[in-house]
């Protein structure tokens, strides 16, 4: 907090010393934006992340004072940046409790998606559901849902999610985050009626497709809303909370399905009740989101400055003159950043995400990060109850295993929060993949034996897989996909990455259905060999292409990508992006990023606008 206090004190001094000039002078915000905009057009430096400037700077008529004013702005930015980066978790929670609470509320919408997708997979192991909608397997004498219908139902909700993701963008532009989420919750509550009163698998398919659209909305806005209202110190915790919500939803589904198996095994309530319980969520969440503050970034983009100020007053804690200064500085930061983005270019298109080498690299990493959640075999966990039955355990025991599995997933996410203080993003991602690969190979080996002990062992090891998945790749991905894109293309990159995940998930789901269904490949636990191999392939990509972003601010990540730093050198490379900004503003000679990487040095008293390896 020392840097923040220093920044506030200098803000007070500057306001006092320039009182007369404020009355008669020129507002330099526009001047500085124009100066930096012109230089930005000549260089690759991303000015959109100069977010911590104090706002209006008041130069006199002598333009020679502009560099001094810019130096002061850069110093303010650097101190605020360092203050947030070094802020401990508990300090951040005490300083920004309301921002954290609102972010947690919005992210809770993901519980519904985790819940519904989990119960769909569990229904395939529920006898009453199998008998009503399945067909008799002449080989086993049991009823089963055909592979084609299992694939079709999965495709329906994934198609709905893809449509929902694409609709979310223009909807947010028109009505904002809050009302888009409330509208999605309203439609979800309406679409649940189709599932509850279903008479055929066709009705379930329609209901899943329609419910998928609001789920797609939740996937995008939970991450973007958290990143816009919360400070850097809480970034990892609040973005990975999305994974925790997913796991909570899956845990609720497992508990409810076990209850259905025990009490309603031969009644339609066995599958209708789990559908009906989805109505619990939309109303209280809609009320909470209605009471939540709108993103101040969206309000400023729409020119609603007074509303943005009131939103910041609700987000930031504290009271008195200090809070007023914090609100003013934050508002100036948002206004200046948006002004620069609007002057430098348009909002950005999907083509911009892949047009140039830098953004193409960032988009590729974001997409492959999320695809890694599919290619590592984690989708097998979603069909754990079905998997356990095929491994030879009873239906009741299968649901018990699922509950234990999701409890381990929740515990693993909390362990991930603790481990993030000592390990980087890449470390957790790679660690999780390596241990998953080992566990899958062991599961595959056990699948070669037909003994009861081997079948029970394979089911138990799948719970271990769930633990390492939720310790490593599952939570880290939500943080990485918010860190990889540039500010201007963040929402569109997240949408592309999630849709890449959805497309690959379709392929993975088809493979799993064929692997587990007794009428098709009937691999059972032997499928562990297949997914263990894909875990190793995903790990190989991560070693080559996934950079380490832990402890890096967005402006530092921008500079590292601009300079083309190799993925494995992100962690050991020092950057001074504020020196780069000052150099751009002063119109010094702009060098090629590769030349910066080779020739830059950091002296005791000053640093060049690029990098030095430790």
UniProtKB/Swiss-Prot annotation:
Its main location: membrane. One of its GO terms (biological process) is maltose metabolic process. The chain crosses the membrane at residues 109-129, 145-165, 181-201, 203-223, 237-257, 273-293, 365-385, 399-419, 428-448, 461-481, 494-514, 527-547. Residues 1-108, 166-180, 224-236, 294-364, 420-427, 482-493, 548-614 are cytoplasmic. Residues 130-144, 202, 258-272, 386-398, 449-460, 515-526 are extracellular. It is a multi-pass membrane protein. InterPro entries: MFS_dom (IPR020846), MFS_sugar_transport-like (IPR005828), MFS_Sugar_Transporters (IPR050360), MFS_trans_sf (IPR036259), Sugar/inositol_transpt (IPR003663), Sugar_transporter_CS (IPR005829). Residues 38-48 have a biased composition (Basic and acidic residues). One of its GO terms (cellular component) is plasma membrane. Keywords: Maltose metabolism, Membrane, Sugar transport, Transmembrane, Transmembrane helix, Transport. Residues 1-48, 594-614 are annotated as: Disordered. It is found in: Membrane. Pfam families: Sugar_tr (PF00083). Transporter for maltose. Belongs to the major facilitator superfamily. Sugar transporter (TC 2.A.1.1) family. This is Maltose permease MAL61. It comes from Saccharomyces cerevisiae (Baker's yeast). The gene is MAL61.
